[in-house]
Amino acid sequence: MAGSLNKVTLIGNLGRDPEIRTTGEGKEIANLSLATTDIWKDRVTGEKKEKTEWHRVVIFNEGLVSVVKNYVKKGSKLYIEGSLQTRKWNDSSGVEKYTTEIVLQNFNSQLILLDSKNSTSSSLQDSGHSEYKHSKPSFDHSDLDDEIPF
């Protein structure tokens, strides 16, 4: 059994277009602002209530950044898996600042586009290499009926 686990899974909508930045080494990084909303009915008033939580998502994986650049925009519904990381820095006044982010990099990160252009679910998983998947079959299954002997 593993000693610990750091895994975050979210389904939500982007609150703004992705921000793509380039590091000094020329590597692209995508920053996303993902909203998740809890909806419930108030027991006393019967009124519908909701609470939206905003999550910072940072993508370092080259393949995932490419998908974000080409297919993701404000309002996109995404499924993401990553790890939770907190970074610390000093602002211009020397005050320590902290931020907690969901980070997608290297292995065990996943990004699924839940509302692609063709109304089919598309996904990109990073398991050592980038691979873009479509849920449509790669061949037509209707041709198989002609070969069944009964």
UniProtKB/Swiss-Prot annotation:
* Protein's GO biological process: DNA recombination; DNA repair; DNA replication
Note down the stretches annotated as region Disordered: 119-150
Q: Does the keyword Acetylation apply?
A: no
Gene Ontology MF annotations: single-stranded DNA binding
Q: Where is this motif: Important for interaction with partner proteins?
A: 145-150
- What is the residue range of the signal peptide feature? none
Q: Which domain of life is it from?
A: Bacteria
Cite the SUPFAM superfamilies for this sequence: Nucleic acid-binding proteins
Enumerate the UniProt keywords alphabetically: DNA damage, DNA recombination, DNA repair, DNA replication, DNA-binding
Please tell me one Gene Ontology term that the record gives under cellular component. nucleoid
Comp. bias regions, Basic and acidic residues = 128-142
Record-annotated DNA-binding residue ranges:
54-60
Kindly give the InterPro entries that the UniProt entry links to this protein.
NA-bd_OB-fold, Primosome_PriB/ssb, ssDNA-bd
| PROSITE patterns for the chain | SSB
- A single Pfam family it belongs to is SSB
SSB domain boundaries: 5-111
Q: How does it assemble?
A: Homotetramer.
- Task of the protein: Plays an important role in DNA replication, recombination and repair. Binds to ssDNA and to an array of partner proteins to recruit them to their sites of action during DNA metabolism.
Stated name of the protein: Single-stranded DNA-binding protein
Upper taxonomic lineage: Bacteria, Pseudomonadati, Pseudomonadota, Alphaproteobacteria, Rickettsiales
